[in-house]
Amino acid sequence: MRPFERVRTALAMWLARPVGVEARKVYWQRLAGGFVERYLSGPHILDIGYRGGNAQAVPIVPHAIGVDLDYPGYDGTRLPFADLSQDALFVSHCLEHIHDYRGSLADWYRVLNIGGYLLIFVPHKWLYERRAAPPSALNRDHKRFYTPGSLLAEIEESLPVNGFRVRHLADNDYAYDYERPIDRHPRGSYEIELVVQKIARPSYSHRLELPVGGPKDAKT
């Protein structure tokens, strides 16, 4: 899409779609900058936890299916969708509320097509919580605090070895007020952005999972 056409399309979508509160903060930038086009243009998209407590919220793109806890067949961990059926999953400010993060991450990976994208956004520990460890003073339902490193650690812990690639990882502090007192709710964006792409695991991948002290011919 040409830059002018992208901006025009982005403006129309930005005006028409009341997406979730956190996603809304940088929705225009992601639309106009090509982020949405790059990662969410496939025909089969899921927006997990899209309402975020706002009953009027809509999924991130018009053709996405919004999945919340009341979605038929969804138990909060396992999605009622077939293996290899989705081109992308958009998960904004949801993972930190999930106790069984391993189960959820593994299931999100399960439904992705080869080449599909898992987009995860979580509050940044030092931008949102601004404290070292739980409990959160701002949202008691937050099970864990995140830095980019700890988020990647959960991904590596939960997904198959050599079955994914990290395509994007960044701190999003757009319009963040660094001078706001620590006892006040932060303003602006305060999240970590992560995009993981599912790949076909190379034939040698099973050898990478062998424990230390395994067969002598195992190579890493």
List each language-model region with its residue ranges.
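A near-ubiquitous, low-amplitude feature marking generic local secondary-structure context
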Residues: 2, 14-19, 72, 88-91, ...
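Short low-complexity stretches enriched in small and charged residues
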Residues: 2-4, 17-24, 44-48, 121, ...
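Class I SAM-dependent methyltransferase Rossmann-like catalytic core
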Residues: 2-39
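Short amphipathic alpha-helical segments, especially helix-boundary/capping motifs
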Residues: 6-9, 81-84, 127-130, 170
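Conserved aromatic-histidine-acidic binding/catalytic patches
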Residues: 20, 93-96, 143, 184
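A short linear-motif detector with a strong N-terminal bias
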Residues: 24-27, 41-46, 98-99, 171-176
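Conserved SAM-binding loop
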Residues: 33-34, 38-128, 194-196
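S-adenosyl-L-methionine-dependent methyltransferase catalytic module, highlighting the catalytic core
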Residues: 38-40, 102-109, 113, 117-220
